[in-house]
Amino acid sequence: MLNLKVAKEQATIVVAMSGGVDSSTVAAILKEDGYNVIGITMQLYNHDTAINRKGACCAGQDIYDAKFVANQLQIPHYVLNYKDKFKESVIDNFIESYINGETPLPCVQCNQSVKFHDLLNFAKDLQADALVTGHYVRRIDTANGIELHKAVDSKKDQSYFLFATTKSQLQYLHFPLGNMTKDETRYHANRYGLHIADKPDSQDICFVADGAYHNVVAKLKPNAKKPGKIVHIDGYILGEHQGIINFTIGQRRRIGISFSDPLYVINIDAQQNIVYVGPESKLFKTTFMIHSLNWLGPGNMLVEPLDVEVKVRSTHSAVRAKLYPYSNSMVKVILNEPEKAIAPGQACVIYKGDLVLGGGWIAKEQTQS
């Protein structure tokens, strides 16, 4: 199943167990297949630091569920305290991103900094042969190296959130569920008699309740709510806001302005503490920059213009575009057709069909258009 260089009965596999059905089923499949499996669960945050809610990844109930499954499978299980690291690398960056007028993507930063860095290094310290997760994405060995591909189940594909995985990390990571559908995963979970077989999927941001991200920001950084101006993109002042952390690009509701036509958040100027609003038509654009490119395609970096498909939000479909190398790991992206609400701080993930070529972070515009 994992195509390792050692025989499965001699291989030690660390499974990142979140307490959900996906990672629990992976652990069960590998145990049944004859591997020596070790379950690891990360404790990521204090409930008094973030906003607690049910259905959150790596919360108290999830740790209990992971340990219960490990006992059922009769595999070793450890809980690692990564709360400080998670706060430093994910929550603090999440807060700063909103303060800077961006729309952050903490799940990618968690994969990038905690799961595939700290946890991966811990697995290596255990002299494990691989770190395995329950992500829906495919890792394919080819003559040209290891490739990352979209999952077979397009509805559950998580490749967008894994674009920052490096080539060296892919040498050690494996994703057995990439060739399964979610229904197949639940079937196997029931077959193994796992008590979490019908457990709902975790939500996107584990430490935010009901999408109220501004409550987390305000709780951990109370001075982040500074009043400022709401300005129409044509230049005139419409009113006052109570903090740019309450806004994101493309937002229509809860702007707090009465106007003859629907208003949307078009841009956020963090330096001037101004929220720019305007008609929906102003949300569409074809050209933007991405920074901190992680390249998974041929060679070490994008070196010439390339026709690709890109996703600018996890919920968006991939659209055709052309990449132009710029400088310092920056790339200009020109879309074939305009896309709506391209938000700084979100990821732009690059594809060629099902192949993940990498991605980067959408950069803020230098000037107000």
UniProtKB/Swiss-Prot annotation:
Pfam families listed in its UniProt record: tRNA_Me_trans (PF03054), tRNA_Me_trans_C (PF20258), tRNA_Me_trans_M (PF20259)
Protein name as catalogued: tRNA-specific 2-thiouridylase MnmA
Gene Ontology molecular function: ATP binding; tRNA binding; tRNA-uridine 2-sulfurtransferase activity
Cell compartments where the protein resides: Cytoplasm
Enzyme class: transferase
Region described as Interaction with tRNA: spans on this chain: 156-158
Domain of life, per lineage: Bacteria
GO biological-process terms attached to the record: tRNA wobble position uridine thiolation
Function statement: Catalyzes the 2-thiolation of uridine at the wobble position (U34) of tRNA, leading to the formation of s(2)U34.
Site feature location: Interaction with tRNA: 135, 346
Record InterPro entries: MnmA-like (IPR004506), MnmA-like_C (IPR046885), MnmA-like_central (IPR046884), MnmA-like_central_sf (IPR023382), Rossmann-like_a/b/a_fold (IPR014729)
GO cellular component terms, A-Z: cytoplasm
Cysteines joined through disulfide linkages: 110-206
Keywords tagged on the record: ATP-binding, Cytoplasm, Disulfide bond, Nucleotide-binding, RNA-binding, Transferase, tRNA processing, tRNA-binding
Assigned EC number: 2.8.1.13
Stretch forming the signal peptide: none
Gene for this chain: mnmA
